[in-house]
Amino acid sequence: MSFTNNTSSVDTSLSSSASSSIPASSSSAAASTSLSSSSVIPSSSSSMLSSSSATAISSSSSSSPLSSSSFTSPASSSFITSLVSSSSQQSSSSSASLTSSSSATLTSSSSASPTSSSSSHALSSSSSSLVASSSSSGMSSSSLSHSSSVPSSSSSYHSSSMTTSGLSSSASIVSSTYRDGPSIITLVSTSYVSEVVTPTTTNNWNSSSSFTSSTSSTPISSSYSSSGTLPSKSNKSSNHVGVVVGCSVAIPVGVVLILIGLGIFLWKRHQRSKRIKAERMQEVEEYGFNPNQPSNFRSPNRAPSTNNRYRGWNGSPTPAAGNNTNGRPVAPRPSAGAGGANPPAASQPGLLGGSSNSAGPIAAATAAGVGADASDAANTGGSFTRPQGARMVRPIGNPPDLSASNEAEATMPPSNGSNFSEGLSASPFESGPAVGAAGAAAEAAEHSGSGSDSYPEGPLATIPESDSESMASDLAGESSYGSRAALSSRSQSNLLSPTSTGASNQPNYSPFADNPSSSNVSIPRSSSEARRLNLF
């Protein structure tokens, strides 16, 4: 590695009339000129040195004490020559050479007469020469020039008094070029220095310019300090952010989830109600069962009852055969087309094994008018037989009171447990059978005198249907005892007339009449009778 320093002789041409002092004045700072081949050194200078005979340069490095020098024309030539031949190492420390930040005092004395002379100094170098001059505000600048000439002129003038203070910053750029084999390497380094300059000048002809430069090695700090930080958020602001996040995110999400759950619940309940309704409708269609219908409602699809309107306990219109050996008397059931409802004489209660030719009971039955068929059989003297299926059994219960007085029987309405006893007398089981001619005559007198109905019916003639209309009609008073007595007396007079020859010309008010004649059913007595006669 070899450094190349190209220096040339410096020719100094001085033209002056005599040797006189050089008044070097500066308005803001001292002048410092450095000439180097490989380095650039800034200096705080605001004006160029001017002199007619010599150039005065004074500098001190690294806060050296103030120095003052005055050079004449012969000495200036050798000094400038030494400056030109100096290398880059002169930038650190030298007694009479370059400084970037120093405090110096330049003093010079001039002659009394203000004469001015101009001189030209031609400084030539193969490398570069730098002249740095700063303005009056204290800001210094550095410039690098290669192969340049620095003219200098001096004039004698009256210096003014000035005091200036300011912040100055200088930049130093050092460039080193060396050869390493076939390649050329150039190193460039930059440093920044801040300084406070306070120049002062005096107001006299022998001007002495002085300034003090204090240098600090710290770099220039930026206007925004690195230690400065933004104000941190307080706990209140962080809590506020949490509240905002909760109100904007958590609450809407929760509300949406609640609405979704409520919708699912309502939908399931609706589906359940629809399923239950469909199952109930299917039950009604398949089984004919409607749970919403009252239990006493009679369905219109119900099968009609038999012609004799008898259903019985076991649902069969054919009751069991009569058997009175077990203490249960046999109740009659008239056949179809029969005019009376009484059983034949052979099956009368108490006439066990009696025949139709028996004297007493048959006569009593005939005198009492018990049954048109029985009276016809007794009058004609022939036998009267019923089909075996036309018998029914009296329901289980207490036997009738045989010791009841005639007055009580005459005054009490018949109570045989049948709803179809309108105009008909009580069952033959309510009063005991007459025994002998006296009993028959008394019974005949009772029937004829009291006007009671001699057309009795059995207690099991029929079991009425649960019909609200018939119940209402019965409760309305249509089946009162007075109307019964009037109707029974009329029917008795018709039945016991001596001109009656058969059942065909007798009025038939029996509920068992399946084919009544038109003449016999011209005027129905009540709504219940009309229903029994199938007139509705």
Swiss-Prot record:
Chief site of localization: membrane
Keywords for this protein: Membrane, Transmembrane, Transmembrane helix
Membrane spanning stretches: 247-267, 351-371
Record field: compositional bias (Low complexity): 7-76, 204-234, 327-350, 430-454, 517-527
GO cellular component: plasma membrane
Spans annotated as Disordered: 1-76, 204-237, 287-354, 373-536
Membrane topology type: Multi-pass membrane protein
A Gene Ontology BP annotation from the UniProt entry: positive regulation of cell integrity MAPK cascade
UniProt biased composition (Polar residues): 290-326, 403-424, 480-509
Compartments where located: Membrane
Protein name: Uncharacterized serine-rich protein C11G7.01
